[in-house]
């Protein structure tokens, strides 16, 4: 057996993992580098108020293998000028003239008003806006009325990446959920096409 008096349990324990729970979402940091995710999420919470995700229900995950460097995908997400050209359905669903980009420490925000008559999202009298947050370096939060979509961009190698979409909904009918997911699928396929074209041209 072991001499309990000579063994220090703290020398053999698992390494502690820093984490933060925010509106039922769990953020985990494995590296020792300083990054105050709580500060970032508190700012985001104020921006999107009164929206809260505590009562949203997890629906599903859709993953995509994309033949481009992960930074190309991030750059495409952060640049909204291509929307009227690459995403005609999305352009019809939003008020592109209201589209704005704001930058903060460790995250950025793109947001715009939604055209309720042509939007695939839940109709909301209190909030008809779409929020697109980028959390450095590779987490995206896409927020529309009644829906949260998180994106995790996972590098594979210099020429490819995985992108994981996780859907959360608040009291939405199944047909409305299908409409939302199908709409996102169309937009994602358009983004995949342009990202892979950019990669092939580098």
Regions of interest found by a model, annotated:
Residues 1-18:
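Long, hydrophobic, well-ordered secondary-structure blocks that form the structural core
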């Amino acid at each position: 057996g072991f001499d309990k008096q000579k063994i220090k349990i703290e020398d053999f324990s698992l390494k502690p993992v820093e984490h933060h729970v925010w509106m039922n979402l769990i953020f985990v940091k494995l590296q020792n580098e300083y990054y105050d995710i709580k500060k970032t999420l508190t700012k985001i919470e104020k921006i999107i108020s009164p929206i809260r995700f505590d009562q949203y229900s997890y629906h599903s995950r859709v993953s995509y293998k994309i033949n481009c460097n992960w930074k190309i995908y991030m750059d495409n997400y952060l640049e909204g000028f291509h929307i009227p050209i690459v995403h005609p359905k999305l352009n019809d669903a939003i008020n592109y003239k209201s589209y704005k980009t704001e930058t903060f420490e460790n995250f950025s925000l793109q947001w715009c008003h939604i055209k309720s008559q042509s939007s695939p999202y839940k109709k909301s009298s209190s909030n008809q806006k779409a929020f697109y947050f980028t959390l450095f370096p590779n987490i995206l939060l896409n927020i529309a009325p009644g829906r949260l979509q998180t994106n995790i961009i996972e590098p594979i190698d210099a020429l490819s990446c995985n992108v994981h979409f996780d859907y959360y909904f608040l009291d939405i009918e199944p047909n409305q959920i299908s409409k939302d997911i199908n709409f996102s699928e169309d937009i994602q396929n358009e983004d995949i096409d342009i990202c892979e074209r950019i990669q092939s041209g580098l």
